[in-house]
Amino acid sequence: MLDIGRVRSALRALDVRPTRAMGQNFLVDSQALAHIVAAGEVDTTPCVVEVGPGLGVLTWELVQRAVHVVAVELDKRLIARLHDEFRDASNLTLVNQDILRTDMVALTGHRPYHVVANLPYAITSPVLRHFLEAPHPPEVMVVLVQREVAQRICAEPGDMSVLAHAMQIRAMPDIVTIVPPESFVPAPAVHSAVLRLRRRPTPLVAPHEEAAVMR
């Protein structure tokens, strides 16, 4: 485990009060971090996009291995801390923006890219769809989500939700590992999972046929 006391102290200093209701959970498990970084294949792509870097725990791992990291954070307090924490990281670009309003072509400069993220539970589905349905989607996405959500996305035909259809049309999903509640501050009420989505070279269904498939 990482130093949970330091994480709590940093949150207090920034007056950030994470809540379970909003799905604000900060990862403090070094083993889970290692799984995310390895699954994200961050050293094989010219650009890695991190969504919600928070206190920079995952960001630190990424800048050690990736060619270029673009970290998108909505909270201005956290962005200010990240600028200070990573002032010497020449391969990191910090962006204070809502990822759901972000143009991925503009963000990545048309480069191939991978996504890694510890996603707030409340915005998991919108963020996944934002990336995979974008004109310039990532080659690989590795996201930390609720275990039940990951299982639904990986469901077999005949037991698939609308979200599972939308994801599997565009990507091949698999669950890398399960992460227990005590790996976070604050601890969520449920287990999480590291979910990997590898983009298909060609979607299984043409865009104009998707509505019929997902009825």
Go through the PLM ranges and name each one.
Residues 1-215:
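Catalytic cores of RNA-modifying enzymes
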